[in-house]
């Protein structure tokens, strides 16, 4: 007897943003390239920046976007809690505004969560950061089976019955949300989840992570091509390798001067 087709869940993608205009078009491309059915996705973007991206959202033509503009900046913990209150999906997937997400970001996370009924949250404790100025890739982790950073999170909405972020959290908000890393968890394949780029607009200078020896940090033989593999992502790759945002940074600096 043939198996019944699996009914895919409706997914809420959540993106907090603050003054990251130069990354937004590339963020849109990462979303457009997702291979999960678009009619089963809503994309919640919460913008508390002073340089609102409403105009870019309008030009994008991405009908899945639900854009919310806040009058003042709030801590990342409160912002993530607010996004959760808006989510309609049974699964919530994070996509931050300045990282690269592969086309299978959503589909891979959904598959892992659905195939592991006991797990409430998914993420990747092993993560890679590419340092443009050094031309080097670094591997971070894995740190533990129930550990991941927020940019890799995907979770069942029922998790929100048991936990929430500290509203006052400004960074490293994951520990409290994962209840000291005790939430039932399933690990994701880092190559199908995220590639972080160290750039001048990072909230925290990521060079501090590699300045001192650390058992959980090592230079990797992986390359950007290990992550950005599709022939349709040439423009995205060029942007992240510096051809996109470095000229824009210079333009911003010249405007200020």
Residue ranges and their predicted role:
Residues 15-26, 36, 49:
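Active-site beta-to-alpha loop of glycosyltransferases that engages the nucleotide-sugar donor
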Residues 70-87:
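Glycine-rich, basic loop-to-helix element that forms the pyrophosphate-binding segment
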Residues 143-231, 239:
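Conserved nucleotide-sugar donor-binding catalytic segment
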Residues 44-56:
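A conserved acidic beta->alpha catalytic loop
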């Amino acid at each position: 007897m043939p198996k019944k087709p699996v009914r895919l869940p409706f997914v809420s993608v959540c993106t907090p943003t603050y003054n990251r205009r130069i990354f937004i078009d590339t963020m849109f491309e990462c979303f457009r390239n997702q291979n999960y059915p678009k009619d089963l996705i809503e994309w919640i973007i919460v913008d508390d920046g002073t340089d609102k991206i409403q105009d870019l959202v309008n030009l994008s033509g991405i009908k899945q976007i639900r854009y919310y503009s806040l009058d003042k900046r709030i801590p990342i913990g409160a912002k993530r809690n607010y996004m959760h209150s808006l989510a309609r999906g049974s699964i919530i997937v994070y996509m931050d505004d300045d990282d690269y997400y592969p086309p299978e970001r959503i589909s891979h996370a959904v598959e892992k969560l659905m195939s592991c009924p006991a797990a409430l949250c998914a993420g990747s404790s092993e993560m890679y950061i590419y340092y443009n100025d050094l031309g080097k890739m670094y591997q971070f982790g894995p740190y533990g089976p129930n550990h991941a950073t927020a940019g890799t999170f995907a979770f069942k909405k029922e998790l929100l019955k048991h936990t929430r972020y500290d509203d006052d959290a400004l960074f490293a908000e994951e520990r409290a949300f994962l209840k000291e890393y005790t939430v039932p968890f399933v690990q994701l394949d880092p190559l199908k989840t995220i590639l972080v780029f160290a750039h001048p607009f990072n909230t925290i200078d990521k060079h501090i992570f590699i300045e001192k020896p650390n058992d959980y940090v090592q230079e990797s033989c992986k390359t950007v091509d290990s992550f950005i593999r599709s022939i349709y992502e040439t423009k995205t790759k060029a942007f992240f390798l510096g051809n996109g945002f470095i000229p824009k940074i210079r333009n911003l600096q010249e405007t200020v001067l």
